[in-house]
Amino acid sequence: MLEAKNILVGITGGIAAYKTVFLVRLLKKAGANVKVVLTQNASTFVSPLTLATLSENPVGIDFTEISEGSLSWNNHVELGLWADYMIIAPATAHTLSKMANGQADNLLLVTYLSAKCPVLIAPAMDLDMFKHPSTKTNLNTLSKNGHAIIPVGNGLLASGLSGEGRMAEPEEILEFLINYHKIFSYI
């Protein structure tokens, strides 16, 4: 279903980032071409090397990187144009706020603002953060902007609390993307 589709995965700095490693693997198994952009904070939760290996592409973290002894520029516009779909998973409350307000202070956010493709967002945060009116406002804004919000799960959270806020499981995100693609590829 996703054969030769270009999927750009954006990973933000939340504990649920570990799930996104498996999502990258599932996307590749489904036949997609995958590129990954991490926030600096996300790189403390998941290894860029692991993601580069699984995606079979270099991972973007910053606007510039040192590769093979020279400095190269990560072109966010090219990344945004390359993608058929962009999935941001996990999307923390911090990043949701920045996205809803058009802030562009890291590679992931400037790529998001440059993307011409559908954007799918998988929120992940603690129960109280998820239920906060500011978070609901940001999610509503992003939804009104045409982005697909992947429903959060309900269960045990990293904080020890139980409730809404868990990032959807990788299989659920893949299924959401496939269904989204089926619906909107005919329009």
Residue locations for each model-derived region?
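A cross-family phosphate/adenosyl-ligand binding-site feature
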Residues: 1-120, 127-187
